[in-house]
C-alpha cells in the first residue's frame, strides 16, 4: 500500500531530523550518531523498510489444507461422467497426473505448516559409514571452462581421498554453487584422480570444454560469515610465498590496501578480495603472519633510546620531547601490526589533524598556514612551560606558565601528551588543551612527534594523520637555498643537516607508516599546502575507513 510506504519513509525521516538533538537528550557520542545516520540513510535499509511494510500489509492464508481429499471427491463424481463426456474424461486424467498430485500434496503441507524434517531412524547401524557407498550417493557435476582458467578451488588429502579444502569467493565454482567444501573428488572425465592435489590442480587447469566431475557430496551446511574489512600493514606477493598451498590462488596486496575478508575458516589461510572489486584469493591469516614476523629481527634504527622519541634528533633542537614513556614501553612491547580491522563511515569531520615528519621538513609552516587560512575552522594548543615569563610575554600568548612542581605532578598523572626539558625548564602539551580546542568546534592541528600518535589514535580524538615526507637530498638543498635568497629563512642548513632530515624522514616512515592516513612529499610548500587543503575537504564529502574500535 502506498500509504504504508509513505508512513515508513516519514518515520525514518523524522528520526533523522531529530538526530541532532540526541547528544543533549541522551548523551550519545557524536561518532555513534554519525554511524547511525549512515545506516539509516543507506538505500539498502530504506529498501528493507519498504519491503517490511509490504509484507505487513497482507498476510496470505490458504483457503484449505485438504485439497487432496477434495480432488478425490471430484474424481468420484467425474467417474460417472467420463464415459459420456470427453471433457470430463480429460479433466479426470489431469487431476490424476502424478505431478499435479505432488503439487497438491506440497500445497497442503505448506498450508498446514508441516515444515519439520522427520528425525533420523534411531536404529541406524553405526557401521553403515564403513560400507561401500551406494551408487545413488554419487553425484556427477558438469563444468564448462577454457584451458588455463582457474576453478577457484583447492584440495587436501584426507583418508587417501582428495577433498575440497576451500572454495575461493567469487571464483567459477563459488558462482555456480555445484561443489562444496568437504566434497570428495573421485573422477575427472571418467579418469580416477588418485591422491595428489597438485596433479589434480594441473589436470583441471589444462582441461577445456566440458569437464565432468564424479563426487561424493559432504552435505555440510555452509555458514554466512560476518563482513570483515581490514587495512593491510605489509606487502604480500603470493608468487614469493613458499607456504601458500596454491600460488595461483593467492591475492597480492600492498601496505595500506583495504581488503574484505570473505572466509576465515582456515586457521592459516584466509580468503579476501580488494574492496574496489576483483576476484578473491588466499592471504596469510593473522596467526600465520604473526608467526613469520616473530622471526624477523626488528630494525634497530626504530628503537627509541632513553625515552626520547627519536635517537637521531639533533642536539640543537630546542626541546627533546618525550611522551608518556610508561605507556610507550607498553605500546612497543605488544606492537606487531599485520591487519587492522576497519569500518566504512559516512563523511564526517575529524577532531584532530596530526602532522608528522622529520625536523625541518615544514610541518610547523603548514600548520600555521592552515590556521591563518581558516581560523574559524582550525586551531591549535598553547604549550605549557615551567620557566618564568619574560617581560614581553603574556599568559596564553605563546605559552601557558605554571610552576615546576605543578607541571611535574601533572606529568606523573599522565595529563601531558608529550613533554621534555630544555635548559632546566619543562615544556609540554597538555591533553586537556587538545580537548579544549575540539570543544570549541575547531579541528585541533598538531605537529607532534610520531609516538604521540599512539595516544591520540582513539575514538575521542579521531585524528587524521598526515606524514610530511622530506624530498630527496638535492631538492631539499635547493629549497633551503631558495628560502635564504627570498628572505623566508635566515638559517643555512649544512649538508649533514639535510642528510639527517632525509634519513630521519625515512626512519619515521618505516616505523610509523601504518598510522598514516596520507603522505605528502614537501618539495614545494605551496603545492603541499593545496594538497593538504584538498584532503581535508574530501573528509567532508567522501566516506572514510576508520579503525573499527572507533565505531563499536
UniProtKB/Swiss-Prot annotation:
GO terms for cellular component: cell-cell junction; cytoplasm; cytoskeleton; dendrite membrane; dendritic shaft; dendritic spine; glutamatergic synapse; plasma membrane. One of its GO terms (biological process) is excitatory postsynaptic potential. Residues 350-537 form the Guanylate kinase-like domain. Residues 140-219 form the PDZ domain. The modification Phosphoserine is found at residues 42, 121. Keywords: Cell projection, Cytoplasm, Cytoskeleton, Membrane, Phosphoprotein, SH3 domain, Synapse. Residues 8-59, 60-118 form the L27 domain. Residues 225-293 form the SH3 domain. Can homomultimerise. Interacts with CACNG2. Interacts (via the SH3-Guanylate kinase-like sub-module) with DLG4/PSD95 and DLGAP1/GKAP. Interacts (via the PDZ domain) with CADM1 (via C-terminus). Interacts with KCNN2/SK2 (via N-terminal domain). Interacts with SRC. Postsynaptic MAGUK scaffold protein that links CADM1 cell adhesion molecules to core components of the postsynaptic density. In CA1 pyramidal neurons, required for synaptic KCNN2-containing channel function and long-term potentiation expression. Seems to negatively regulate SRC function in epithelial cells. This is MAGUK p55 subfamily member 2. It comes from Rattus norvegicus (Rat).
Amino acid at each position: 500500500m502506498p500509504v504504508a510506504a509513505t508512513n515508513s519513509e516519514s518515520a525514518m525521516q523524522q528520526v533523522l531530523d531529530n538526530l541532532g538533538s540526541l547528544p543533549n537528550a541522551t548523551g550519545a557520542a557524536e561518532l555513534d550518531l554519525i554511524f547511525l545516520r549512515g545506516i539509516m540513510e543507506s538505500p539498502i535499509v530504506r529498501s528493507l523498510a519498504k519491503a517490511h511494510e509490504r509484507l505487513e500489509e497482507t498476510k496470505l492464508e490458504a483457503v484449505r489444507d485438504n485439497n487432496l481429499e477434495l480432488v478425490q471427491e471430484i474424481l468420484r463424481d467425474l467417474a460417472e461422467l467420463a464415459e459420456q463426456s470427453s471433457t470430463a474424461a480429460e479433466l479426470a486424467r489431469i487431476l490424476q497426473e502424478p505431478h499435479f498430485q505432488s503439487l497438491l500434496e506440497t500445497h497442503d503441507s505448506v498450508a498446514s505448516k508441516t515444515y519439520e524434517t522427520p528425525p533420523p531412524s534411531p536404529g541406524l547401524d553405526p557401521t553403515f559409514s564403513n560400507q561401500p557407498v551406494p551408487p545413488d550417493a554419487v553425484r556427477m557435476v558438469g563444468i564448462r571452462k577454457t584451458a588455463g582458467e582457474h576453478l577457484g578451488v583447492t584440495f587436501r588429502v584426507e583418508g587417501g581421498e582428495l577433498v575440497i579444502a576451500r572454495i575461493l569467493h567469487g571464483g567459477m565454482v563459488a558462482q555456480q554453487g555445484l561443489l562444496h567444501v568437504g566434497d570428495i573428488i573421485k573422477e575427472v572425465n571418467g579418469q580416477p584422480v588418485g591422491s595428489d592435489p597438485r596433479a589434480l590442480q594441473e589436470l583441471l587447469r589444462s582441461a577445456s570444454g566440458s569437464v565432468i566431475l564424479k563426487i561424493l557430496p559432504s552435505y555440510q551446511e555452509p555458514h554466512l560469515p560476518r563482513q570483515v574489512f581490514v587495512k593491510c600493514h605489509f606487502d604480500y606477493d603470493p608468487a614469493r610465498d613458499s607456504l601458500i598451498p596454491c600460488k595461483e590462488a593467492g591475492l597480492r596486496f600492498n601496505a595500506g590496501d583495504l581488503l574484505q575478508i570473505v572466509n576465515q575458516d582456515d586457521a592459516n589461510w584466509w580468503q579476501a578480495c580488494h574492496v574496489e572489486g576483483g576476484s578473491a584469493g588466499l592471504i596469510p591469516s593473522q596467526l600465520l603472519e604473526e608467526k613469520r614476523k616473530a622471526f624477523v629481527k626488528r630494525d634497530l634504527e626504530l628503537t627509541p633510546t632513553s625515552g626520547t622519541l627519536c635517537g637521531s634528533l639533533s642536539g640543537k633542537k630546542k626541546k627533546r620531547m618525550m611522551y608518556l614513556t610508561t605507556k610507550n614501553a607498553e605500546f612497543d612491547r605488544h606492537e606487531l601490526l599485520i591487519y587492522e580491522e576497519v569500518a566504512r563511515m559516512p563523511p564526517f569531520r575529524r577532531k584532530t589533524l596530526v602532522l608528522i615528519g622529520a625536523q625541518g621538513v615544514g610541518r610547523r609552516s603548514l600548520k600555521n598556514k592552515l590556521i591563518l587560512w581558516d581560523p574559524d575552522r582550525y586551531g591549535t594548543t598553547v604549550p605549557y612551560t615551567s620557566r618564568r615569563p619574560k617581560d614581553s610575554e603574556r599568559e596564553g600568548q605563546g605559552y601557558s606558565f605554571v610552576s615546576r612542581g605543578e607541571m611535574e605532578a601533572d606529568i606523573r598523572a599522565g595529563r601531558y601528551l608529550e613533554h621534555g626539558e630544555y635548559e632546566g625548564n619543562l615544556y609540554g602539551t597538555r591533553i586537556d588543551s587538545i580537548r579544549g580546542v575540539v570543544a570549541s568546534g575547531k579541528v585541533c592541528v598538531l605537529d607532534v612527534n610520531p609516538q604521540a600518535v599512539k595516544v591520540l589514535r582513539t575514538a575521542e580524538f579521531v585524528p587524521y594523520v598526515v606524514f610530511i615526507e622530506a624530498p630527496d637530498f638535492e631538492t631539499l638543498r635547493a629549497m633551503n637555498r631558495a628560502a635564504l635568497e627570498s628572505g623566508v629563512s635566515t638559517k643555512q642548513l649544512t649538508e649533514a643537516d639535510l642528510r639527517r632530515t632525509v634519513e630521519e624522514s625515512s626512519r619515521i616512515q618505516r616505523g610509523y607508516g601504518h598510522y598514516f592516513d596520507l603522505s605528502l612529499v614537501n618539495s614545494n610548500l605551496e603545492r603541499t599546502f593545496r594538497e593538504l587543503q584538498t584532503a581535508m575537504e574530501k573528509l567532508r564529502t567522501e566516506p572514510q575507513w576508520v579503525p573499527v574500535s572507533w565505531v563499536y
